[in-house]
Amino acid sequence: MTAPTEAAAETADADGFTSLRIKNVVRETDDAISIVFDVPPHLAEHFSYRAGQYLALRIQVDGQEYRRCYSMSSSPVKHQDLRVTIKRDRDGVVSNWLNDHAGPGDRISVAAPEGRFVRSGKDRELVAFAGGSGITPVFSLIQTELAESAGRARLLYANREATSVIFREALDGLVDEHGDRFGLQHHLDVEQGVVTAEKIAAFIAEAGTDADCYVCGPGPFMDTVERALLDAGVPAEQVHLERFTVAPVPTPSSGAQVTETVTIELDRETVTVDYRAGHTLLQMARMAGLRAPSSCETGSCGTCIALVTEGEARLLNNDALDEDEVAEGLVVTCQAIPTSPTIRFVYE
């Protein structure tokens, strides 16, 4: 991890990152920690956030720079400090490094909060479905909902086993504090098998299909929950999804169209480079030496949006653009793979 100076913490750098000091590291489970950041008063507005949003962290491990996004588990109405919770990913360089090495006093480069996994229908009951570390943004949403409204919240929280439950004591505390305003149901795969569509349907039936539903967890879990909610009659606009990972870039088939060149326009500069198979448009912009805007790199925040003016691209994941915007040629470059012989896109 790099160690920026105190002066570097005063303002954001050219990429929008600010150095923050780690105030505390909390061991939540054997494979998950929470990092609490100390935000100086003069940066409080810059780091203001809504429940459900995330922080992008930039660190260096063994001389290589990495950017990763982690959801905040703190509540903006209950906590002054920012807290992100990070679970080990077996193959994750950053999550493992932070779990092993992050400590109080260390400094990490952090971008301002972003994310669209936020409360939208405050007149509706909040019903959440979390799997594993997917509890992180959901916990922020639930704490905030119970603190600033008189409404109810329900949570179905799935984990492999009891020892992997993050925030167990804190969740039990919310049940004790708010009584029947907060309904909590744990699901353990080792005892009950994986969560089924039938279980999801039964859970949502208690709240009704007018609920505002929030879903975060492993891909298969999220797919099951999303399908079950839609099948139960919950309107699609009331089903909110937050994906921590996206599908890997596929290997082109032998008969696939081969892209030869990529042309990027950014800040009145135009650069054309040879395309490298399997790379996103954002990666190509960086390889061309351009300081392309980015943050989450999962297709969620919209920071890296650009307009394709020539050629075509397909999106591996897209939670930032609607159908009309995609039809106009807009892409999230972190998830865009070119599909035409040449492609030209503009960062606006």
Feature locations, PLM:
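Iron-sulfur (Fe-S) cluster-binding segments and ferredoxin-like electron-carrier domains
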Residues: 271, 284-288, 293, 302-348
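Ferredoxin-reductase
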Residues: 2-107, 125, 159-161, 172-175, ...
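Active-site proximal loops enriched in glycine and acidic residues that flank catalytic Cys/His/Asp
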Residues: 217, 243, 264-266, 275-277, ...
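FNR/FR-type flavoprotein reductase catalytic core
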Residues: 96-265, 270
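Ligand-binding loop in jelly-roll beta-barrel domains
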Residues: 76-80, 121-124, 152, 338-347
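C-terminal accessory/binding modules appended to enzymatic or scaffolding proteins
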Residues: 258-297
